[in-house]
């Protein structure tokens, strides 16, 4: 007898920024009675990733059909989020987004645990709103170093943890990264140039958080924020080729993934990581700077 269970696969592509759980088949049987074939986009001159028209990557029940829409039935092309437990026994990481709530800024993050994610989401929402409002009144630039120190110090004092957290704040003119290990942020520009804004490092007591500010340019295409479950097995170049094809090219119709190009990109990256044997939780956030809500 088939029984459904809710596994920690979270896909998001709504304007409201809320995460939604999707129902997936239990690992004891396959989706729809068989392994779901995932056809990856063909990438020229890249034999590692490229697939022929008849090639499929089988990703059984670990990845399920994803067709998520927001409350108004619209999809958001600005960002896509996917979290997969993968081959781990538990989901130890969590993602958080704050979209369309703060004038000119959206917030995306990957954290060690749901409690830390929720804390940062609430605290950053308040701190960024306050800083943006104060700076607008004074006509000066935001003090992101103050925001970062306030948030991390409150996290240690309130949540009682020094674990990893990586936050990307996307504004109209800048991208701000607050990093305390655990995930990697890469900004991709025209012709596949990859600019790492944050490297993965295992946080230890005494290691300071890192602040990076990148002034946005017209050649900036998209950002991928992901944990080592992706980066351990998928290269920067493979990531660029796949996401570029999803956002700006054409994918074969699959009937499973939502209309959001950003969500398609995040899902395919997660599926590729699983197909390549990733052993960690996989969290992927794809931010399309060309169609971002704050662009």
UniProtKB/Swiss-Prot annotation:
Q: Name one Pfam family in it.
A: PP2C
For whether the record's keyword set contains Cell wall biogenesis/degradation, the answer is no
Extract the InterPro entries matched here: PP2C (IPR015655), PPM-type-like_dom_sf (IPR036457), PPM-type_phosphatase-like_dom (IPR001932)
Q: Entry's CDD domains?
A: PP2Cc
Could you list the residue ranges forming a coiled coil in this record?
Answer: none
Which Cys residues form disulphide pairs? none
Signal peptide boundaries: none
Give the similarity note. Belongs to the PP2C family.
Question: What cofactor requirement does the entry state?
Answer: Mg(2+); Mn(2+)
Which species is this UniProt entry from?
A: Arabidopsis thaliana (Mouse-ear cress)
Q: Where does Mn(2+) 1 bind?
A: 112-113
Q: What is its EC number?
A: 3.1.3.16
Task: Return one Gene Ontology term, BP aspect.
Answer: seed dormancy process
Q: What class of enzyme is it?
A: hydrolase
Residues at which Mn(2+) 2 binds: 112, 228, 280
Domain PPM-type phosphatase: residue ranges: 78-289
Gene3D superfamilies tied to this protein = PPM-type phosphatase domain
The protein's name in its UniProt record = Probable protein phosphatase 2C 54
Annotated Gene Ontology cellular components are:
nucleus
User: Per its record, what are the GO molecular function terms?
Assistant: metal ion binding; phosphoprotein phosphatase activity; protein serine/threonine phosphatase activity; pseudophosphatase activity
Which terms are listed as keywords in the entry? Hydrolase, Magnesium, Manganese, Metal-binding, Protein phosphatase
């Amino acid at each position: 007898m088939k029984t459904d269970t809710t596994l920690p696969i979270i896909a998001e592509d709504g304007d409201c920024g809320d995460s939604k759980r999707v129902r997936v088949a239990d690992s004891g049987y396959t989706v729809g009675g068989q392994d779901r074939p995932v056809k990856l986009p063909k990438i020229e001159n890249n034999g590692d990733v490229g697939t022929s028209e008849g090639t499929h990557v089988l990703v059984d029940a670990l990845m399920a059909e994803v067709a998520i829409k927001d409350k108004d039935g619209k999809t958001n092309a600005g960002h896509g989020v996917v979290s997969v437990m993968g081959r781990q026994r538990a989901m130890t990481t969590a993602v958080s987004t704050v979209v369309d709530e703060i004038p000119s800024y959206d917030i995306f993050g990957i954290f060690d645990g749901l409690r830390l994610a929720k804390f940062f989401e609430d605290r950053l929402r308040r701190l960024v709103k306050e800083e943006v409002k104060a700076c607008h009144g004074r006509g000066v630039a935001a003090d992101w170093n103050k925001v970062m120190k306030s948030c991390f110090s409150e996290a240690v004092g309130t949540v009682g943890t020094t674990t990893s957290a990586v936050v990307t704040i996307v504004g109209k003119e800048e991208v701000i990264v607050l990093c305390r290990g655990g995930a990697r942020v890469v900004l991709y520009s025209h012709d596949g140039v990859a600019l790492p804004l944050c490297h993965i490092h295992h946080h230890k007591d005494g290691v300071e958080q890192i602040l990076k500010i990148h002034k946005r340019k017209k050649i900036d295409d998209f950002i991928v924020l992901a944990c080592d479950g992706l980066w351990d097995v998928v290269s920067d170049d493979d990531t660029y080729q796949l996401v570029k094809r999803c956002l700006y090219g054409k994918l074969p119709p699959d009937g499973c993934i939502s209309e959001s190009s950003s969500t398609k990109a995040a899902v395919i990256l997660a599926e590729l990581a699983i197909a390549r044997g990733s052993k960690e939780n996989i969290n992927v956030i794809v931010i399309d700077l060309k169609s971002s809500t704050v662009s």
